[in-house]
């Protein structure tokens, strides 16, 4: 996977290759505010264009097939799927009350308890119902019914056809089990990341008992079958590999850390997807839940189509959580139920607080960008096999934060000055050249040298030669191969 960045640190291209075959290939364009304007598929040429409101909230996308997808926010952050914002009704705190397909009913704590195609089941202005008030509505075929633990975690979901999905958690709110259709799905965590999961038949699940000291004892061994191990990018929530049955699947994620492709060990694509403006999957190839991770921190349950988001569950079909933010307004989300304003830049890893997660590279100051043609500097990380040259004087100006380099040796000083537009009035004496080989991962800004005109107008140099800018000061001494006196042959 290779990425290039502009001078502001925004990723402008991302490519992956497998066994010398082109894989994921995207080009990105950003506006002056750092918001994603469009994405071009480098293989098909398809373009997706995004639009934002005055405060930077993502409000629509026009996909490569010409279809529009709306996520229109109102003044308080509630989102609508129609351009005229007439397809939904909202209540206090941003809870959705009604859309084109369902009515939504809540308990007194603000947790969603019924999603039903039946209309007009309550007259309460915020659709609150409860057994205590005698307003509880029973599940019927076609409904989704939700039950909650006392700590606000989702306990179970009864599906429209009658089957029930149940959930269990540890004391830290990490989900440890899901029970559905006679099977137990188990999860093992390392801190805040899920590292393993497996499943087996519910009849084989060991029973638990409490001894005289209050300790929980497991009666027998728990089966470990169909084990899946997840590998993550170091220090992050971004999955990079799936290990299952002796096979390793490589996961490719986009600049936000969202999985977009998975390859088997033969280099074949086994899973592929894009995302819509609500974070739901589009253009899926392969089995949907083969890779269950979505926005950072989210894990999709195929049975409910909800995203488990640690302390809450997100519904990508409506763009809302189904319960209030446990930390209320401190979460900094648009509403108590709302997800982040801009899904192309922000995420909510724990279902508590939104934060900017867009992966960026280093930026280049405006003063240096002016020395590149049209101010265009593309940032990338070197491979570790590349050679660069720094031409300089006796002072050996390698200690500066930013150093200009080239990728070739010059036979004449005139050619060097013309390509790099080095004016005589600057007093730059070319006496030495330092050859160095930066380690893999070192950032370099690249472009072509900008045209330069002397103050009196008598010297004009067009530039246009390759020009790089790099922080040599931070490079280990081992990267410097040699410094020698320049010997031009022409």
Residue ranges and their predicted role:
Residues 25-36, 42, 47-56, 112-118, ...:
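Surface-exposed extracellular loop regions of Gram-negative outer-membrane beta-barrel proteins
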Residues 1-7, 13-20, 38-44, 60-66, ...:
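Beta-turn initiation residues at beta-strand->coil junctions
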Residues 19-25, 118-143, 203-222:
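Intrinsically disordered, low-complexity Ser/Thr- and acidic-rich flexible linkers and loops
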Residues 262, 280-282, 312-322, 326-327, ...:
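Short, low-complexity export/processing leader segments characterized by acidic and small residues
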Residues 3, 28, 50, 71, ...:
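A residue-level detector for well-ordered beta-strand positions
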Residues 26, 74-75, 85-92, 245-310, ...:
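A motif-centric feature for acidic-aromatic and gly/ser/thr-rich catalytic loops and repeats
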